[in-house]
Amino acid sequence: MALWGVSDADESKPKWLSDTDKSNTFASAAGWVLRKTVGSRTLEEVLVAAQGLATGIGVADITAIDWVSTTFDRSAGGTLSATVSYNEAVTVSGTPTLSVTNGNQGSGSGRGPHVLTYASGSTTNQLTFTLAIGAANAATNANDVLSFGANAVAHAGGSTIVDTVGGGTATITSAAGIGTAAGTITVVA
């Protein structure tokens, strides 16, 4: 088996990368690229040159959904933030959304799902989605468990997510396992 390849499978990324580096690696017209942030600078390095890789692998696919925030305090309020990673750079138009399931484990019911809106990341392989929730807001209760399910990304209000190279419509469907891998956030009082 090769260490890398030209296919739309996430497994085609260079094998020696750490899990974090795999999330920051994407296909480009030049090959597999690793994006790192060093201080205030964002650096990109071509790890494996494979001319035309981004067009050869087809449409962009979701490879991971991860929480940026790892906790949420209902009494203080704050911003829920998550990143959706693609296997190649995508361009966003409009305001797509990301749905978060609230298991309503806290007292009461009827909270959620929560809808995070697109905040940043167009022309990269990582899109950030956010939702501000005020202090003591009824949207969450202590002990609620927030998670991602299958097909959490949606094209709200005519928004689009397309391949930056090639322009094909990026996949917005994802298996439940991708959301499950992100883990959960348990709301504290």
Could you tell me what each predicted segment is?
Residues 1-189:
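Non-catalytic beta-sheet/beta-sandwich ligand-binding modules that flank or precede catalytic cores
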